[in-house]
Amino acid sequence: MQIQDLAIPEPLRQQYLGLGIRELYPPQAACVERGLLDGKNLLVAIPTASGKTLIAEMAMHRHIANGGKCLYIVPLKALASEKYEEFGNKGVKVGLSTGDLDRRDDALGKNDIIVATSEKVDSLLRNGARWIPDITLVVIDEIHLIDSPDRGPTLEMVIAKMRSKNPGMQLIGLSATIGNPKVLAGWLDAELVTSSWRPVDLRQGVFYDNRIQFAERMRPVKQVSKNYDDLNLCLDTIAEGGQCLVFVSSRRNAEAFAKRAAGAIKSEDAALAACAERLLEGTPTEMVKTLAACVAKGAAFHHAGLSRKERSIVEEAFRKNLLKCISSTPTLAAGLNLPARRVIIRDYLRFSAGEGMQPIPVSEYRQMAGRAGRPRLDPYGEAVLIAKEAEQVPELFEVYIEAEAEDVHSRIAEPTALYTHVLSLVASGFAGTRGELTEFMNRSFYVHEHKQGRLIHRAIDEALQFLITAEMVVEVGEHIGATELGTLVSRMYIDPRSAFAIVTTLREQEKYADLGLIQLICTTPDMPTLYAKNADLPALSRMLEVRGADIWLPPPLDDDAAETYYRAVKTAMLLSDWTDELSEEKICERYGVGPGDVFGMVENINWLLHATSQLARMFVPKFYGQIADCEICMKNGIRRELLPLVRLRGIGRVRARRLFNNGITSPEELSRHKKEDLVKILGSGIAEQVLEQLHPSKDTGKKEPPSGDKNTNPGQSTLFHFG
């Protein structure tokens, strides 16, 4: 099917032709034949790199040309940013929405395409974004993640809510290959398009005894290292001019492999040296120093312990073919477009708490294998598993290469998932009686899949009972409605169980303590926590003794609850160190984490502190001011004494501390100093910016930003700028 013959807007056609795209891939042509450009719902379940983005683009531009508006839903913020850049180069207005979860973001409605995570879309629905009814097309990328225990329930509810709000809209689900696509397509009332076609031939095999066994042939691999099969496979690819991705089970393994690969590759490229220098800007941690040393020689590791900036540098260098090899945990396979000639799946067993080492699912193997082969760059792609012994070769073929993908299932019936979604349905006006609630849930993927809803109806009753007891929902006769507390909790996008614990504990306290508040938040379901090893317990116990007066929740008597308790305490200690202005490097060293971990924890608790301050403002006002100040301290990583200074735009933790140590403790004191004094402390650019806020020029028309504005100066050393 030729691009020239398609009913798509002429500007898009010319862009495709300019890029050398003259004919559709077979799966893309099948989508057009099934009604892609005629408003039909579609479920497209095809391999990675088979042209899903172009399928979505054609449909979106068709809608935009007809006056419509499109919503593109992704699972990850990083993928949202990637799609935002990609769609923005096609001559339409694109908006990106991944930020605060209590905002309506009405300005987004000015765009033709809005890109957002499923959590953000759920939040926009809860907060009543005015442009939602204008959406004529919803594209759900990675729709197979409806099976995810963490994110699946939210994605399922977003789809159900959008279909309820906009029954006439078109819906396109983009999926990896799954075992039960007909079931999912049936729920979506969608035409099903499946295919095994790929633009680059994928060869899947198992490595053992210096040979790769493919389905129909054997390929020898030169033995460079006697001890490391993964390294031999990697160097074999590089010798032929290709790049390599190596997937391993842990961060430690990823870093260890990158060091070995760097030692073998030994590149001396000036561009790589420049990448390494960029990584070392600021105050690098030991992890980042290791990464920079690897990058300088042509290899890298990639995992969630790195900051967004560091991951971005690695990804960019790999796309430019500067880096020859990346070793990664499976995070890299989840959505990011980073293909390579050969993908090595070294570790196909993963530790699972309570179950020991378990094989990864077929879907995860396929996600990783799908990264093999760069369209228009590689003649083929190879996905290679590594067998430890000869007997494993046929086993790995059977379990992964020849196996069917797993079915996807609804996760919405989990009681803990239902608490938040039942509350949002009631608070957002989707349901005003138990009957309407049941009727809405009867349209869920769960009920479609199981053909009955007895289990989910019982779970709904359990969730409602909790919400009524927690005073978030009231029931009068047959009517149910959200209370002021319930409405706020739904708007703030936190788990009702978190809100109940926070409000209850705050009401019990006579005296406020930052550490007590941080510890409380770290015990909630919304806050991920650090693993507490046995070796950590003495230090944690000492901290509890020393800071006992500031601890709100004492150790549990039940041994089964001890692990959860000490995880929360350890996380609270890390966050307390952050607000005590301990350097990022020392925090990473003390707690055995990476910059990305610290950033993630600060980002999470900062949102929960914001929600807590709003809960306190309405329901525990005696603590509101202190909690609001704690939120600012956490955002900037500062002690309270710096609060007056960081309210100025351009002043973060480093510059505020520098001013304070020079005897300048407030904006008032700062305004009394001469410009030349401030230049010595802050530098000329920031000094002028700060003075302009304190003494606005009459002829510039500039206004001082509102107190608490986010710092925009990239030189500030907070994790939010490193992020």
Curated annotation (Swiss-Prot):
A motif (DEAH box) lies at residues 141-144. Keywords: ATP-binding, DNA damage, DNA repair, DNA-binding, Helicase, Hydrolase, Isomerase, Nucleotide-binding. It catalyses: Couples ATP hydrolysis with the unwinding of duplex DNA by translocating in the 3'-5' direction; ATP + H2O = ADP + phosphate + H(+). InterPro entries: DEAD/DEAH_box_helicase_dom, Hel308-like_dom4, Hel308_SKI2-like, Helicase_ATP-bd, Helicase_C-like, Helicase_Hel308, HTH_61, P-loop_NTPase. SUPFAM superfamilies: P-loop containing nucleoside triphosphate hydrolases, Sec63 N-terminal domain-like, Winged helix' DNA-binding domain. Its EC number is 5.6.2.4. ATP binds at Q28, I46, P47, T48, A49, S50, G51, K52, T53. GO terms for molecular function: 3'-5' DNA helicase activity; ATP binding; ATP hydrolysis activity; DNA binding. It comes from the Archaea. Residues 709-723 have a biased composition (Polar residues). Residues 695-707 have a biased composition (Basic and acidic residues). Residues 33-196 form the Helicase ATP-binding domain. GO terms for biological process: DNA repair. Residues 693-723 are annotated as: Disordered. The keyword Transmembrane helix does not apply. It holds the Pfam family Helicase_dom4_arc. The keyword Cell wall biogenesis/degradation does not apply. Residues 230-416 form the Helicase C-terminal domain. Monomer. Belongs to the helicase family. Hel308 subfamily. DNA-dependent ATPase and 3'-5' DNA helicase that may be involved in repair of stalled replication forks. NCBIfam families: PRK02362.1 (NF002654). This is ATP-dependent DNA helicase Hel308. It comes from Methanoregula boonei (strain DSM 21154 / JCM 14090 / 6A8). The lineage of its organism: Archaea, Methanobacteriati, Methanobacteriota, Stenosarchaea group, Methanomicrobia.
